């Protein structure tokens, strides 16, 4: 059972959003999103029922166990993407994807909380001009919320990538400065720290996928969540640094010169043993 906070009952906007949560949640159907349970009783106070999900949040896992294995992270990311697609199919954005809102149960991830969900059409009619600050958590919300730019599915992608980065590193990609950034100038000077700096076991191509999904400019992120997931699973040549590529690709001339030198040396050694003795 979820009930509204007593401290916020005097806030009409909060009460309105709370009432909307049940309706929003009832529209979403996915094994990776917490389910709204229909109440058969006549209600005498404000509440709604949700599925009981046993398990630990991703934040619990990180705080108690540190970084998580890449294979598990990819599996959980797959689950979260399936959950987010359920929102996106209903023209909704979750807007508050963060480690505390993802529960792990039997090795699978489930998205919880509907308090910040944006529903196309509905929000435009009910949202006041004063309600410009994002309802989600600043540390994980995409820059466009604070810059008052259009929010899209790529906004959820950014938040998801923040969570994936934290699962793999127990850190955040832009440091403490990200949460404090509120304008274009502040966002423009942010420095992305590669995931493998914090965790050397992270492949460079996985970091490349994270870096793309975490672009401050939403236009530079992935077109779809499936592309992001694919690049987490399989190496994308675009993200392989020159140093990681074979010598024949980096410098064909040097490769063939080196190979020729090896062959010549091999021939000389053979001749020495045949005629030098």
List each language-model region with its residue ranges.
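Conserved short submotifs of the Hanks-type protein kinase catalytic core
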Residues: 43-57
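AlphaC helix of the protein kinase catalytic domain
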Residues: 58-68
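Activation segment signature within eukaryotic-like protein kinase domains
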Residues: 76-77
